Amino acid sequence: MVHVRKNHLTMTAEEKRRFVHAVLEIKRRGIYDRFVKLHIQINSTDYLDKETGKRLGHVNPGFLPWHRQYLLKFEQALQKVDPRVTLPYWDWTTDHGENSPLWSDTFMGGNGRPGDRRVMTGPFARRNGWKLNISVIPEGPEDPALNGNYTHDDRDYLVRDFGTLTPDLPTPQELEQTLDLTVYDCPPWNHTSGGTPPYESFRNHLEGYTKFAWEPRLGKLHGAAHVWTGGHMMYIGSPNDPVFFLNHCMIDRCWALWQARHPDVPHYLPTVPTQDVPDLNTPLGPWHTKTPADLLDHTRFYTYDQ
């Protein structure tokens, strides 16, 4: 059966209740923390060494197919609790601000309190039972997404800090300009790809490591949602905040929209073996069960409501 992923704004109260219940249940069973640990591991220096240096989940062409498989695995875990549950998405181009229903006390909970920025409301507050068991913070001044260096974070509570590090969530114009790009990715297949005309890296613009010359700052789209939310969403342990999955569901939807807009171009690059990055036929670790080619058609697994 192919499920439909919805904008959280169109979900019924019962659908939201079921989703939250399933998330809490896989957390109780220890399954949720495995997803947090995996997301940390795939960007660590240790994992990069084991995988012969190939980056799989971030800052490379594999960003989109790797997270597509990751979300599928997470969604399947939820569906073992409740087969009716599907992942919702957060369309941050129109759904702005901390007064959004996204942050209600019965769904994601709200912003962190002043001072330590601890989340105090909703099902994912520490005082309501949501304990962080695996968390890291950056080590050293360089962007850890580039060097893979992290150290232990001993806070066992979820932290958010809305709008402090960037005041703005993505705009419809930002997304449209990125969706208009016709090349999936380009050499050198990293955080610098597509940063100059003709801007040939849809992946890197969507991931947020590059920008158009007329845009004011780096960190747009995917990156902006992480940075605007702040707190634990800033680090590679970001799945500790369940809103991570709504953000990445939106990113996956953007890839699907881009594919539909450009049916006649390669939907993944590189197509041939390439040093340091996964090509079209590289089995994606740690599962090694699917390649980017296997994941191009999302309608085999689910559809989006729009």
Swiss-Prot record:
Regulation of its activity: Inhibited by 3-amino-4-hydroxybenzensulfonic acid, 4-hydroxy-3-nitrobenzaldehyde, L-tyrosine, p-hydroxybenzaldehyde. Activated by the copper chaperone GriE.
Cofactor note (record): Binds 2 copper ions per subunit.
Biological function: Involved in the biosynthesis of the parasiticide antibiotic grixazone. Catalyzes the oxidation of 3-amino-4-hydroxybenzoate (3,4-AHBOA) to yield the corresponding quinone imine which is then non-enzymatically conjugated with the thiol group of N-acetylcysteine. The resultant compound is oxidized to its quinone imine enzymatically and is then dimerized non-enzymatically with another quinone imine oxidized by GriF to yield grixazone B. 3-amino-4-hydroxybenzaldehyde (3,4-AHBAL) can also be used as substrate to yield grixazone A.
Summarize what the entry records about the temperature dependence of activity. Answer: Optimum temperature is 55 degrees Celsius.
Positions binding Cu(2+) A in this chain are H39, H58, H67
Residues that coordinate or bind Cu(2+) B: H222, H226, H248
Query: Which organism's genome codes for this protein?
Result: Streptomyces griseus subsp. griseus (strain JCM 4626 / CBS 651.72 / NBRC 13350 / KCC S-0626 / ISP 5235)
- GO molecular function (one): copper ion binding
The record ties this protein, via PANTHER family, to:
TYROSINASE FAMILY MEMBER (PTHR11474), TYROSINASE-LIKE PROTEIN TYR-1-RELATED (PTHR11474:SF126)
| InterPro entries noted in UniProt | Di-copper_centre_dom_sf, Tyrosinase/Hemocyanin, Tyrosinase_Cu-bd
Q: What is this protein called?
A: Grixazone synthase
Q: Which family does the record claim for this protein?
A: Belongs to the tyrosinase family.
Enzyme Commission code: 1.10.3.15, 1.10.3.4
